[in-house]
Amino acid sequence: MLIAAPSRRRFMQGATALPLFGATSVFGADKPSAVIGRVLAMSDLHSAYERSAQLLAALRAEVRSHPVPHLIAIDGDIFEHGNVVSVRSEGAIDWAFLAALPAIAPTVVNLGNHDNDLTPDLHEVVARMRGLGITVLSNIVDARNGRPYAPAATELTFGGRRLRIAGFGTNSLNTYPKASRDWLSIPDPTQWANIQLPTLLDGADLTLVMSHAGVAGDRGMLSALPDGVLMIGGHNHLLFQETLGRGLYAHTGSWSNAYTAADYLSDGSVRAQSRTVALDGPADPALAALIRTTLNRHLTDQERVILGTSSTALSLGDTGRAVAAAFARFAGAQAGFIGHTTLGTGLSAGPVSRYAFDAVVRFDGKLMAAEVPAARLAELTTLANQDRVMPFARRTGDFVYGAVEGGEQRETVRIVTTDWCALNQHEYFGVTDLAFAEVPGPGVKAVAAAGLLKP
């Protein structure tokens, strides 16, 4: 039987990216409740130096313009081993950013899977953060001696109230730096949270839970959280908010493109707004100067080479779909897919250097193709493009950006993706039976650059 493959236009319908700015009021009320304190939350910064100074300025402006207690909460993945300047400078910009935060507001970090990218031993990372006056949380244990790298919970003064904070990470060991994996003992986050959180949060006044486990790890624990909790999620580079009774579960974006400003209200509820961090927005002068100096010192001529020009700026999701379409065209496929965290940030307009492009497409690799019955294409695209508005029940955490090319009728279709997604097809496509074969020729980055940029 001949089945028409979904057209690119049909596949893209409903895939409009979530706006990076928009108030989400958890509860409407005839009389507004007073704000008793605010949390400025962010995750997955990944040494995104193009916006680090703007983010720092935005956080300072938030605190100055709202005369209530504040907490800055970073939910993991501050550093990025794929950023050559970060590696060569030993994270000088990242550490300067962190050093500036406690002077703005009390700061807490929950460790993610990239926070030892530059310094493999997490004990050293935690000690340095504490030396800056930052509170560090984690449920990761040193497998060499059984010592926790940091406590899993703490309680801080929050104006006239007390804020209990718990933090935990992902147990996806293959996402941590290879040199450190034998030193890490990480429990299943859902099991750990369901056992430990009731005790850790018992008797708390106000509660904040920071998870770097991702949506898949978080889903099974949400119903066990206390009412009025603020839970910050990370790891998946997502931006959305989901109400939890009077509380809120929020993913805050990535790559310093956005942060979430959450208010604890006097009626026991939480509300939040997502804020964009504009590339051309106000920047902290000292950090901006350090960024310029550090880039000038550490970038090579090869990394400054202009690979091409982008005629327009693209959101992260639109960048992903454009790369997926480029894969499909190159491989003669009807559909292309790329894993969401293979990408870092959206493509900027204008000339794009090799260094800047490496922040767009983080990882190289092989292209892999498979032939599938046309009837299965809809099944495989179900989990794609989760940057769109969609029911929380359908969110999976890991996902692909996808594009379908052409609408001709055919019995089988050819799909193409990266070797990472092919290897981990259950996480990205929800199946395990796809038989992928390598696509000869250039790899992921070369094909993506050719598809995104003009000479």
Language model regions located:
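Short, well-ordered coil loops that connect the C-terminus of an alpha-helix to the N-terminus
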Residues: 17, 68, 227-228, 332-333, ...
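Catalytic centers of hydrolytic enzymes
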Residues: 36, 42, 47-48, 256-330, ...
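Acidic, metal/ion-coordinating pockets
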Residues: 29-282, 318-326
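Short, flexible active-site loop motifs that bind/organize anionic cofactors or intermediates
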Residues: 1-2, 183, 367
